[in-house]
Amino acid sequence: MFKFHAIKLRINIRPPNSKSQGFWLHFGLAIATFVGIICLAVLPAITQQPVTVKVLIQALEGTQWEPLVEDFNNEHPNLRLEVVKGPNNTNLVEDLYTSAFLLGDSPYDLVYMDIVWVQKFAAAGWLSSLSDRVTETQLDAYLEGDVNGGRYEGKLYRMPFRTDGGMLYYRTDLLKEIGAEPPETFEELMTLSNTLQEQELVPWGYVWQGKQYEGLSAMFTEILEGYGGFWIDADTQEVGLDKPEAIAAVEFLRDTISEGISPPGVTTYAEEETRRLFQNGNSAFLRNWPYVYSLASDSEIAGKFAIKPMVHQPEHGSGACLGGWGFGISASSDNQDEAWTVIEYFSRPEVQIKYFLETGYVPAKTSLFNDPQLVAKFSYLPDLLNVVQNPVLRPPVAQYAQASDILQRYLSAALTGSQTPEQAMQAAANETRALLKR
């Protein structure tokens, strides 16, 4: 059993005289004021941690971001941008974002996304609208296609950062040798390819992405545009895959194989396989993305090629399938204002110039295509602007991923000969219509 003993404390206080009382009173007040100021100034700095803004990104680009992330964090001591490096496969990054959102509380404040993810993510309620944070005048500085690709039901959900667009690469030296101009139409492309092959100047005429993957859908979007067709009308939900223009587009691609213009293996080629064929001097024409330019400029065909918009039918125009990446804000984030601060930083011209000089990516701001620093290093940028200013978007529908899978499967069947173009496109159209009605 515990025992407690009382302790007596006796304090003798003598009454101070009036002079000492005044001195100690003022001294005490001064000390209290000083301590209060120190607490107000120092304690928040000690106890307040920077707000962390998280974003998931492909590992390669995450590494390329490191200088910008360091600069941002130094410039914003109360914020900390944290980059989570994911796989380099963009489909897997999309899956990781999707899984995080489906769990109900995504750890990511920023969403760095491909243009084709916008509709799916916005329709699911996973993104916050950016419309109240940016004016239309500010958006006018960007490529129109990139801005429109970031909208869903009239609201903006994605701020453009860098763009991409499909184009035609061609060998200037080979065309000069036969005294020809670059092709403008599908027929001219076939004729020039055949001439160059007959004169044994090049093994193959034209290479393109025929493998069953997203690149096949992107490539076909451009051919379809060149024939005056369409995939899905996002406003009316009408499907155009079984119309004559779409069937003619498939027949053109089949003809490049059957007539020996393209190699039989083209139906297994993605971007890199086609780039290597062109870069090694084995093809006169190539459909690909801007990244090829820098690589080909450091190869045996350096100075012997140029770019132009894709070929098309005489009565129709060219269209570049628009790709590219931009920023959204997670609807579940508690740090939405801070996430917008990051977007504002990445939108500054000087930040973008620094990044694009280092990486060779293509800016989404139109003025940067003629920026002296960028043009001095990437002389093709003004020509590239002519390409990306005539974009064709993949269908901006929430079910895009499933629609693309349908198209890829049936295109592959038609290109490999297991179905006729009519059979394949009719089946693709029927499945797509059923998908849109779900």
Where do the language-model regions lie?
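Conserved C-terminal helix/tail region of periplasmic/extracytoplasmic solute-binding proteins
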Residues: 2, 24, 30, 49, ...
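Glycine-centered hinge/linker elements that transmit conformational signals in sensory
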Residues: 192-195, 199, 235-267, 310
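Long, aromatic- and glycine/proline-rich binding clefts that accommodate carbohydrate-like moieties
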Residues: 48, 303, 308, 357-409, ...
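A structural signal for short loop-to-beta-strand junctions that line the ligand-binding cleft
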Residues: 99, 106-109, 137-174, 204, ...
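Extracytoplasmic/periplasmic substrate-recognition and gating elements
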Residues: 74-75, 80-85, 98, 156, ...
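Hinge/lid segment of periplasmic solute-binding proteins
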Residues: 113-165, 181, 190, 216-221, ...
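Extracytoplasmic/periplasmic solute-binding protein
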Residues: 153, 157-161, 166, 190-239, ...
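Extracytoplasmic "Venus flytrap"/periplasmic binding protein-like
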Residues: 71, 75-142, 149-151, 173, ...
